[in-house]
Amino acid sequence: SFDKAVIYYDRLYENNPSDDNYNYLLKCFLALEDYKSAEKLAENQVKKHPSTMRYKVDVGTIYNKSGDESKAEKEYSKIIKSLDKASVSQILELGKAFSEIDENQLALEVYYKGRKQVGKAYPFNFQIAQILGQQGNIEGMITEYLDVLEISTGYIQSVQNTLNRVIGFDEESKYNAILKEQLMLRIQKNPESDIYSQMLIWALMQQNKYEAA
C-alpha cells in the first residue's frame, strides 16, 4: 500500500535524495492526496536544483491535483516568464515536462519562446511538429518539418524518416496531398534551392513504393 511505501521512500530519499527516489516519494504523496507534503518536497527540490525546470513544473502539478487550478496556472506562467535567460537544454526540458502532463499548449508556448530567443542555433521544429501532429494539425506539422530544411539541409534524413512514419503515402492520403502541395509552392518560391525538389522526388518515390506493395 501507499501508506507503507511512503514511509519506505521517505527514509530512502532522506539517505539518498536521487531523482528516482524523489519521483517515487512524490508519487506516494500524490496517491495519498497529501498535497502539503508533496508541495514541501517539490519546493525543496527546486531550492536544491534551481536550474532544473521540471521540478518547478511539479510544484504547479501539485496545485492542479489539489484542485487549485488558478494557482497552478500562475505557477506555470511564472516558469515560462523565467525562460528569458534559459539555455536550449532547459527549454527542451521544460517543454518535455509540460508534454508529459498533457499541457501541450504550454509546451508549444515554451518552444515558440525558445525559438525567438535562440534563433537558428536550435529551431525546435521537431518538438513543435510532434505536438501539432498529436493535435491533428497535420498542415502545421508538415510546415514545421519543411521549414527546418531552410535552416539546414542536413536535417533532410531526419525529416524524411519522420514523415515516413506519420504520413500514408497512398494517393488518396490527404496528408500526402498536403505535403506535395507545400513542396510545389516552395519549389516555385525558391527555384534556386534544390532541397524541396529532392523532397518532392522522395515523396513521389514513397508513393510509388506504397502502390507497388
Where are these regions (language model features)?
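Canonical positions in the second alpha-helix
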Residues: 11-12, 44-45, 78-80, 113-114, ...
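TPR/TPR-like (Sel1-like) alpha-helical repeat modules
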Residues: 47, 116, 133-157, 164-168
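Structural register within alpha-helical repeat arrays
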Residues: 25, 59, 93-94, 98, ...
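TPR alpha-solenoid repeat register
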Residues: 21-22, 55, 89-90, 124, ...
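Register position in tetratricopeptide repeats
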Residues: 31-32, 65, 100, 134-135, ...
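Short coil turns that delineate tetratricopeptide repeat
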Residues: 16-17, 50, 84-85, 118-119, ...
